[in-house]
Amino acid sequence: DIQKLPKKFTIRIMAFGVNNIVELVFWPVFLFSVVNAYTSFGLIFLIAELAALVGAIWLGSIENRNKLLKILRIGGVLCSLIWLSRIFITGALILAAVTIVGAFLHNLVEIPFNTLEYDRIIKKRYLAEFVVFRGILESIGKIVLLGVLAIFMHYNAAFLTSAVMYLTFLF
């Protein structure tokens, strides 16, 4: 039964919701406010997506599940550090570099987590129910983040929340 999923799993899925909205909405808006040029902004995200693609290809070749778990934990720490650094960095060039590195590192969390969890879910034969449950949990994570931002009203609150959420992948 899907209701019997471990609590740490549900928290990790909510963390994905938080991290996705920060990465796909708040970070680009913040970065554009610093870079302030469409071509530079587009180039940064083009290079970031290429870095993410390289990471995805590399991670896709790993079949050892124990190795994936180790990569997941390392990725959680590194992504957390990247998001913490975004609070303190101000220069456009360094922000661009952090964006590119962050895109690669995000795959160190997302691909191993999805691989390990889908393996487990498929074995228990409730994939359709899981997909719906995952969507609900990601939405709850997004609502939590928006609540935090409603209180603190600053980009740094989103970046700090994302840093903390990446640490949930250590356990």
Residue spans for each PLM region:
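A membrane-interface helix-boundary motif in multi-pass transporters
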Residues: 147-170
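Helix-loop junctions at membrane interfaces in 12-TM secondary transporters
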Residues: 85-102
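Short amphipathic helix-loop junctions that connect adjacent transmembrane helices
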Residues: 25-42
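Interfacial helix-cap and linker-helix signal at transmembrane-aqueous boundaries
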Residues: 31, 62-64, 148-153
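Substrate-agnostic recognition of the 12-TM MFS/MFS-like secondary transporter fold
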Residues: 5-24, 48-61, 98-148
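Structural signature of the two symmetry-related core transmembrane helices
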Residues: 70-85
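Intracellular loop-helix junctions on the cytosolic face of multi-pass helical membrane proteins
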Residues: 1-13, 164-171
